[in-house]
């Protein structure tokens, strides 16, 4: 009887352990366990309005959602104008609600005191060079293929004014097509 119970439990755990799930994997799980997912193509769950930090992931989301990407080149822990842009615009409910429906958000950070992996530093530096970023904050709007649409930076006036500015930049690009 005991052997049958052990055999049953072993089979049950084997079958349940091998059952695939259709649940998306959280971004944090992939970032915290890169070896676990290194050989797999994983669909990462991204919440609308959430800031991404990986270029390739942002491109994939933009293609899937058919949205432009707002790339924030920032020095989040030392750049005064970056901090102002974050506190006056990016952290406001108006902007967050707008971004959820209209943008993929990508933050490429160049901090002085916040630890980053060497891979992230190199990837961010590569994009900084590609887009000829000379100062912070620089906001670059790109399409789902990564081609620059427009660029801007800090602007006074708060979230509503900034949203209008972004819409103008995106509308001008659509008018050119």
Positions of predicted regions on the chain:
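Positively charged n-region of N-terminal signal peptides that target proteins for export
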Residues: 1-5
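C-terminal motif of bacterial Sec signal peptides marking the signal peptidase cleavage site
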Residues: 15-17
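Bacterial signal peptide processing site
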Residues: 19-21
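Thiol-based oxidoreductase modules, predominantly thioredoxin-like and allied folds used
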Residues: 49-52, 88, 92-122
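A short beta-strand-turn-helix
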Residues: 51-69, 99
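Short pre-active-site segment immediately N-terminal to redox-active cysteine/selenocysteine motifs
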Residues: 66-69, 74-78, 135
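Non-catalytic, surface beta->alpha helical segment in thiol-disulfide oxidoreductase systems
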Residues: 88, 129-175
